Structure formats: C-alpha cells, structure tokens
Swiss-Prot record:
GO terms for cellular component: cytoplasm. The active site is at H191 (tele-phosphohistidine intermediate), C506 (proton donor). General (non sugar-specific) component of the phosphoenolpyruvate-dependent sugar phosphotransferase system (sugar PTS). This major carbohydrate active-transport system catalyzes the phosphorylation of incoming sugar substrates concomitantly with their translocation across the cell membrane. Enzyme I transfers the phosphoryl group from phosphoenolpyruvate (PEP) to the phosphoryl carrier protein (HPr). Its EC number is 2.7.3.9. The reaction takes place in three steps, mediated by a phosphocarrier histidine residue located on the surface of the central domain. The two first partial reactions are catalyzed at an active site located on the N-terminal domain, and the third partial reaction is catalyzed at an active site located on the C-terminal domain. For catalytic turnover, the central domain swivels from the concave surface of the N-terminal domain to that of the C-terminal domain. It comes from Lactococcus lactis subsp. lactis (strain IL1403) (Streptococcus lactis). The N-terminal domain contains the HPr binding site, the central domain the pyrophosphate/phosphate carrier histidine, and the C-terminal domain the pyruvate binding site. One of its GO terms (biological process) is phosphoenolpyruvate-dependent sugar phosphotransferase system. This is Phosphoenolpyruvate-protein phosphotransferase. It catalyses: L-histidyl-[protein] + phosphoenolpyruvate = N(pros)-phospho-L-histidyl-[protein] + pyruvate. InterPro entries: PEP-util_enz_mobile_dom (IPR008279), PEP-utilizing_PTS_enzyme (IPR050499), PEP_util_AS (IPR018274), PEP_util_C (IPR000121), PEP_util_CS (IPR023151), Phosphohistidine_dom_sf (IPR036637), PTS_EI (IPR024692), PTS_EI-like (IPR006318). Pfam families: PEP-utilisers_N, PEP-utilizers, PEP-utilizers_C. The gene is ptsI. Homodimer.
C-alpha cells in the first residue's frame, strides 16, 4: 500500500530508488558457555579478516572523497584489528573461560577502552579508545551475522534513510549510487542539508519517523523540491516523479547557460554572488557554478578531518590551494569555529548545558588554551595571502572588545612574519560574522572598526527566536522571514554602508528564493550560498528590478507583523 510522508525540502532534485537503511543494528548478545574453543577462535579470525577487508575498501573510497590525510583514520582502525596482543588476549579468554567469541571480544575491548579513556591527560590514547569502540562494533556485527551500514560500500542506486547523517557519513556518499537521502530530523540549515546541496543530492529532512516505517530495499520516491516522500509508489506515481526530475534537469540546463554571465538585475544593478566551501576540493564546484567569490571558507573541517592539530604548513597549503584555485577572486576565510556540534577528538571541550551558547569559535581562539591554535592559523593565512585576494573574518563575536583582541593578535603575527622576511599581501580585509543579536544591534559601532560584515543567518535566527534549529518541536519558530529578523539584517547592512563598508551574508538565507528579493532591496552587497544555488539565484536576480525590490523591503520592514505577511508581499512583488 502506498504511503506518503511530508518533510522539509532541503536539497532540490527527484529520485526513485530502493531504500538503504543507515541505522545502527542491535548488537546485543548472550554470554554462552562453549566446549569447542577452536571453532570460536575460527569465528573470531573470520570476523577480524572480514572487518579488515571492509575497512580497506572503505578507506580506498574515502581517499577519493576526503583525501589521504582524512582517510587515515581507517588506518588506525585497521591497526587495532591487526594488533596481535589484543587478538591473543581475546583467544585466551575464549579458552580460559570457555565463552563465546562475542563475550570474549567485549571483555577484552572494554578493558582496553577503560584503560585508554582513563588517560585524561593523553589525547592520543583517548583517541585510540574511540578507534577500539568503532572496530568492536564492526567485528561484533560480523560475529552476530548482522549488517553494519557502510555508506562507502554502496554499489547500487539507493536512497539513504537515516535518523540523521553525520559529516563522516556524508563524506562517504558516492553520488553515482546515492540518489537521495531522507532523515527523521534536521532542517534546511542543518549540516545534512548543507552537505546535500553541496553534493547535489536530493534530500528531504525532518520526517520524524521514516526509519520506523521503511524496510531495507523498499521502493521510495523522493522529491527534494516539494518535501514529499512516497513509500511503495505506484507505476503512475513513479512516472510523475521521473517527469518532475526531467523538468528540474531541464531547468538546471537553462541556469547553466548563465555560468559566465554577470549578476545584473533587469535595471542594471550588480550584486556579488559567492559560494560557501568546507575544503579545497570544493573550489571546483564554485568555479563550475559561476560564483564570483568565496564568501565563506569553513576552516574547521581542516581540524575535524585531522588526527591532530594541523600544522602551520598544512594549513598554508590548504589556504594557498583555495586562493590559487579562485584565480584572484575574493576568498573570505572564517577562522576556526570549533565547539557547539563541532568537536575534535584531540582537543578537550568541556561538557556544557548549552554548548551552542558556550565556549566555542572566537571564544576558544581568545582563550589561553586556544591562543596557540589561533596564532598558527593566522600565520598560515597571512603567508598564503600572496596567492590571491584574501579576506579574514572572525566568528561568534558578541563584543567590540573581542574583535579588538582578535585584531591585536592578527597584527602581532603579521608584524612577526614581516620581521622574519616572509611576504604578506597588502590590504587584507578583516571583518566579523554577525550571528549574535548583540552584535547586530551594535553594528554601527562595529562598523567603525571592521572592514566588512558577513551575516550568519543560521545562528542569528536561532539565537534571536530562541529556537533550536534542530528541534522539530520548535521548528515553527525558525523563521528567516520574520520581520524581527529582517529588521536586524537591515540594521547591519545600513550600519556598514554608513561607514563605507560592505555587508554580505553567508547563511543559507542568502540563497533562499523568497529571501533574495528582500535582501536585494535592503542593499546586501554579497550573497554567499551553496555553490549549487548560485545559478538559480542569478536567474532570479536577472528578472527583478532593484528599485522595485527596495519598495518591497521597505514595505516588509515597516508594515508586516508576521512571516506569512512577508511571504505574501514577496509573492505579490515578484510574480
């Protein structure tokens, strides 16, 4: 029987394929007394060998998607599997206690995990504990004969169904086989959504319970355009979805013709369309989609994909590659934004009641613990500045004094490099992200000291509305077009322009087709979005009149009380 679910349309596109459930299996087992210890040893050896082969395959695929350094985590996992001491201890438990391989494996690995986790002053050993946990799950799954999901090993067309997708999950996805994904939780601004748009994979998020309704291999039809997911679609419904997919492909072909065109409105006004990236590999997509700049380079992925703090030289090479890849076009680099939901296995973050409101981003950089990291990153950026048009911005700034402190460290490192005879570019612009309401309200004072603003709407909206963007129960409060949000944004843009500075936006709102006309009217200078949204936004801007959009935004700011009123007004002015 056909069932239809409605979720959040998070990444455009249409797909019809079999479901691949990316859910953790039940790995519970009973401890059994056994007589044939040789057979248990053989079962263990077979599970270890199969796990080793799987991890090698996963690593080989991860090298192509993540790069050699990031994929090295799988080397650590394979070293655990190949550890003769651990294997010998597991076999000793099998023989001494006459228990099944599952029980012996758990006893020995739990012992090692406990020892390593107890070394609180040794980040390397704590990281090994995490490796053992991951490897134990894989070996246990093979002993129990249950499937452990491995996205990297998918070799047929599927639609991923999951509670949510982690950065490591999405990094393993092969677009050739993964045609879409659907999750229980998440929204348009969640990591899963952003990655889906970057990879150009259709996605529907926030369905609440799809993992409970779908079985492995069940046929699904997914529309990232409407947010619809159909379980067991009829032949007629499959045909409708295929037609919708063809229509969307034709639309994309029309947009592709604008790749080398200027972003100019119907009345001749130019706006800068930029793209957001997470790794140097993303630059190719930026250029393929005709972006005029990079408005946000999320450098924290350099840290998250490494096994230890990236060195100054490692970072220099990454920043150099991005700047050279953009051939002189502007690149805005955000200094590391660690904390919140972005953790590092080799850097201890405190357990906090509200990590998104806690010790993160620039707050870490300005601390004693983060000072060395921050200076290393700034030195690498300054060294790379000679390879392109670099702009630097600091995230999570609430106070003018925070910006001054960060700028002071920047100036100190710049002076040191120059004294060492290291070339540094002239005229590097240094700005801040506006993502905290306090900074948005005080934009007029910040504008006197910074070179530019980049509005980070993903956090600005959730902080202003006091609504966790990942919490489905309060998702109705996450309103990009709420008049309160629009007034904050307008305040920031006007404050920048009053001091002769420029204002950009790097949140997902910058590529939102309802928000773009409003932002044009407010005078936003740079729109930075997922690279795959650039051409669609250029197409929209080319048919709009900037003067008319000024009327629209003025009316929305002065007359609208609700998000619904704003949306209706945009529809009236853009139809």
């Amino acid at each position: 029987m056909t069932t239809m679910l409605k979720g959040i349309a998070a990444s455009s596109g249409v797909a019809v394929a079999k479901a691949y459930l990316l859910v953790q299996p039940d790995l519970s087992f009973e401890t059994k007394t056994i007589a044939d210890t040789a057979n248990e040893e053989a079962r263990l050896d077979a599970a270890l060998a199969t796990s080793q082969s799987e991890l090698q395959l996963i690593k080989d695929k991860a090298v192509t998607t993540l790069g050699e350094e990031a994929a090295s985590v799988f080397d650590a996992h394979m070293m655990v599997l190949a550890d003769p001491d651990m294997t010998a201890q597991i076999k000793a438990v099998i023989n001494d206690k006459k228990v099944n391989a599952e029980s012996a494996l758990k006893e020995v690995t739990d012992m090692f995990i406990g020892i390593f986790e107890g070394m609180t002053d040794n980040a390397y050993m704590q990281e090994r504990a995490a490796d053992i946990k991951d490897v134990t799950k894989r070996v246990l799954a093979h002993l129990l004969g249950v499937k452990l999901p491995s996205p990297a090993l998918i070799d047929e067309e599927v639609i991923i169904v999951a509670e949510d997708l982690t950065p490591s999950d999405t990094a393993q996805l092969d677009k050739k086989f993964v045609k879409a994904f659907v999750t229980n939780i998440g929204g348009r601004t969640s990591h899963s959504a952003i990655m889906a748009r970057t990879l150009e994979i259709p996605a529907v998020l926030g369905t609440n319970n799809i993992t409970e309704l779908v079985s492995e291999g069940q046929l699904l039809a997914v529309s990232g355009l409407t947010g619809e997911v159909i379980l067991d679609p009829s032949t007629e419904q499959q045909s409708e979805f295929h037609k919708a997919g063809e229509a969307y492909a034709a639309q994309k072909a029309e947009w592709a013709a604008l790749k080398d065109a200027e972003t100019v409105t119907a009345d001749g006004r130019h706006y800068e369309l930029a793209a957001n990236i997470g790794t140097p590999k993303d630059v190719e997509g930026v250029n393929d989609n005709g972006a005029e700049a990079i408005g946000l380079y999320r450098t924290e992925f350099l840290y998250m994909d490494a096994q230890d703090f990236p060195t100054e030289d490692d970072q220099y090479e990454a920043y150099k590659a991005v700047l050279e890849g953009m051939n002189g076009k502007p690149v805005v680099v955000r200094t590391m934004d660690i904390g919140g939901d972005k953790t590092l296995p080799y850097f201890d973050l405190p357990k906090e009641m509200n990590p998104f409101l806690g010790w993160r981003a620039l707050r870490i950089s300005l601390s004693t613990a983060g000072d060395g990291m921050f200076r290393t990153q700034l030195r690498a950026l300054l060294r790379a500045s000679v390879h392109g048009q670099l702009r630097i911005m600091f995230p999570m700034v609430a106070l003018v004094t925070e910006f001054r402190a960060a700028k002071k460290i920047y100036d100190e490192e710049k002076a040191k490099l120059i004294a060492e005879g290291v070339p540094v570019a002239d005229g590097i612009e240094v700005g801040i992200m506006i993502e905290i309401p306090a900074a948005a309200m005080l934009a007029d004072q910040f504008a006197k000291e910074v070179d530019f603003f980049s509005i980070g709407t993903n956090d600005l909206i959730q902080y202003t509305m006091a609504a966790d963007r990942m919490n489905e129960q309060v998702s109705y409060l996450y309103q990009p077009y709420n008049p309160s949000i629009l007034r904050l944004i307008n305040n920031v843009i006007k404050a920048a322009h009053a001091e002769g500075k420029w204002a950009g936006m790097c949140g997902e709102m910058a590529g939102d087709q309802t928000a773009v006309p409003l932002l044009m009217g407010m005078g936003l200078d740079e729109f930075s979005m997922s690279a795959t949204s650039v051409l669609q936004t250029r197409s929209l801007m080319k048919r709009l009149d900037s003067k008319k959009m000024e009327e629209l935004s003025s009316k929305a700011l002065s007359e609208c009380a609700t998000m619904e009123e704003v949306i209706a007004l945009v529809e009236e002015y853009t139809k």
